[in-house]
Amino acid sequence: MSERYPIIAITGSSGAGTTSVTRTFENIFRREGVKSVVIEGDSFHRYDRAEMKVKMAEAERTGNMNFSHFGEENNLFGELENLFRSYAETGTGMHRHYLHSPEEAAPFGQEPGTFTQWEPLPADTDLLFYEGLHGGVVTDSVNVAQYPNLLIGVVPVINLEWIQKLWRDKKQRGYSTEAVTDTILRRMPDYVNYICPQFSRTHVNFQRVPCVDTSNPFISREIPAPDESMVVIRFANPKGIDFQYLLSMIHDSFMSRANTIVVPGGKMELAMQLIFTPFVLRMMERRKRAAQ
């Protein structure tokens, strides 16, 4: 961890809701005048969309039915660790973008599903903000989790996570239920081995729990609304967290354990604002002292 060049990382599976958390942080950064550089985890996949289809077909022909974006084989873990290390030491590093859609690809004159060229990070940023699958990953050869000053896990209960992924991939990307289900099944070993362990390394976890029946996520026609859920917020180290303040500010919240507060689903963004604004301000104070 670096006080002069801090890193915030949001880690969560596909469909977990990390994008909405990123929007909350963008609001905090804008309000507090923090200049951040945002890194999307997709940009550290090893293969672009077309290459991934070819590699997946090759893997299936050899009997590997679990070839996925979640595992080490298909990601540039070493390059991600190098970026975090370089930024923590010098405030610099190399990054690129993954172009998901025609709208994102058009300014670069490229096809969707491709990567831009590697380029240096912008100069004079206050912090690096990562959102993706592997912000807290640790393997035999890399340790990404050691660098973030603040590591946040976004992990709905599994059925809700699947409902969110099914809805997004069907509505926004045009996939069938069968295709999304195949993806979920194919990713399961890597989900267990690479995604889940990260949530034991995070500083804070947000777990949305539905209060409606999600027993069979594959037939759900809609995502449970925020008001139909609760959010369990767990702090790895509760020292310094003003739980009484949070309880007074968030209506219908309560403590379930000494390090855990539960809030209504519709209050998740408010909870994040109340919890993380002081974190960010303290980071900026330490950064100023370290630069002197």
Swiss-Prot record:
Enzyme class: transferase
Pathway note: Carbohydrate biosynthesis; Calvin cycle
GO BP: any one term: reductive pentose-phosphate cycle
An example molecular function term from Gene Ontology annotations: phosphoribulokinase activity
Keywords: ATP-binding, Calvin cycle, Kinase, Nucleotide-binding, Transferase
Record field: catalytic activity: D-ribulose 5-phosphate + ATP = D-ribulose 1,5-bisphosphate + ADP + H(+)
The protein's Enzyme Commission number: 2.7.1.19
Subunit structure and binding partners: Homooctamer.
Protein name: Phosphoribulokinase, chromosomal
Gene: cfxP
